[in-house]
Structure formats: structure tokens, C-alpha cells
A protein has these predicted regions:
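Extracellular, repeat-based ectodomains that mediate carbohydrate processing or recognition
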Residues: 1-219
Length: 219
């Protein structure tokens, strides 16, 4: 509760599939977001090969009383290679969006890319399906972070090792509207610096300012 007291004392196994016991492999990197009505969603990386090939991104919804709303479900549509580093954000209208890193070079065409999938308030996937977030495909795109924006959309940030414009690692972001459409193209958040193995910008985080401006901060 707001005072820090435990309201529901028993821990739960998020990644267990009903009727089949514990999943094989590891379930790691859990992230969660609160949803409308007091419920929440947990997303994580599954290493058992349930998505057909290597690591996959799965999620599970819960109501306000910690009751699971169905079994865990697969988020990524592309099952080739590794999907990892999930992040999740609550959206206006009761839905949510999951972002992650994929090293399926056949989709991004160059190393790792950042992908997004949006879900509606009832937990059903939005019609746009799996979306490639990054515009540039130079090098790899890693460690996505995501935040809701004041206009009902959301912002995804990540870092790239593509050495663009003479820089080494750089942080970029992409804005989306409430329907999952891109608003413009990706934007560099970090200041370009000469290529130097000892200078890099990575591990981004996003915060929406607690005012009516709609401004946000990326670190």
C-alpha cells in the first residue's frame, strides 16, 4: 500500500503455463507497468525456445487483486534469433506497449534492432503488429527504454553503435502517437563526440515531466 506495507503476501510465478508445470529454460529481465483499474502487466525474456528459436519476449496481465488474466503470451512475432531487453509502458485508454531488442538481421538488415508491439485495453494486440522502431540500421541498436507522453502516445529511446557522424555510441529516440504511428523520424538525444573507445553514450532512461508542458528528459 502507499505506506509500504505488504498487501498480498504470497509471491507468484509469472511464467508458469497452466497445466504444464514450470517452463523449461530461464525467464529473466522482468519489467512491469501499472494498467488502468489497478491491474498490471509483466514482460520478460524467455530462453526456453517457446517462440520457435532462442530467446523470446513474453508477457502476462494481472488484475488489481493479483489474479492472472490468462496465461503468458508471446509478444514478438519474429522468432528468428534472440529477442531480449524488454521494456513496457502503460498507455492512455488502458493499453500498453512492449519494446525490445532483436538481433534478427533479416528484419533490421544490420545487426540488432529495436522493435515495438502495442496492446489494447482488453489485452488484444493492436492491428499494426510488430513495428521496427529505429530508422537508421547502421550498426546495432540496444537497450530500449520507453515512457508515456502527455499526448497519449509514447517515446522510445535506445543507443546505437553505428558510429554515425563521427560518434561512437549515441542515444536516439522515436516518438509515437496514441495509435502507434511514428511521429517524424528518430532523433539524436546525445551530443556527437569524435569516435573514441573511452567516450560513449548508452543505457538511456526517459522521464516525462510532472507538469502540463509535455516535455520529457532522456538521460
Amino acid at each position: 500500500n502507499p505506506d509500504g506495507a505488504v498487501m498480498y503476501g504470497a509471491e507468484q510465478v509469472v511464467s508458469r503455463v497452466a497445466g504444464s508445470g514450470n517452463q523449461a529454460g530461464d525467464q529473466a529481465n522482468p519489467v512491469m507497468a501499472m494498467l488502468d483499474g489497478g491491474g498490471y502487466v509483466v514482460a520478460y525474456t524467455d530462453t526456453s525456445g517457446l517462440d520457435g528459436n532462442g530467446y523470446g519476449i513474453f508477457a502476462r496481465r494481472y488484475d488489481a487483486n493479483d489474479n492472472p488474466l490468462g496465461d503468458p503470451f508471446q509478444v514478438n512475432l519474429t522468432g528468428l534469433h534472440t529477442q531480449d531487453e524488454p521494456a513496457v509502458v502503460r498507455l492512455s485508454g488502458g493499453g500498453f506497449a512492449v519494446v525490445w531488442t532483436s538481433n534478427d538481421y533479416l528484419v533490421d538488415n544490420s545487426g540488432d534492432g529495436v522493435f515495438m508491439r502495442r496492446y489494447l485495453a482488453d489485452g488484444s494486440p493492436a492491428p499494426e503488429g510488430e513495428v521496427l522502431v529505429n530508422t537508421s540500421i547502421s550498426g546495432n541498436q540496444y537497450q530500449p527504454a520507453v515512457s508515456q507522453s502527455q499526448d497519449g502516445g509514447f517515446i522510445v529511446a535506445w543507443y546505437s553503435d553505428g558510429e554515425r557522424d563521427g560518434s561512437y555510441y549515441d542515444v536516439f529516440f522515436q516518438r509515437f502517437d496514441a495509435s502507434g504511428n511514428k511521429l517524424g523520424i528518430e532523433t539524436r538525444a546525445s551530443t556527437p563526440v569524435p569516435v573514441n573507445p573511452y567516450i560513449a553514450e548508452y543505457e538511456p532512461a526517459i522521464a516525462l515531466l510532472n507538469d502540463s508542458s509535455g516535455d520529457f528528459v532522456i538521460t
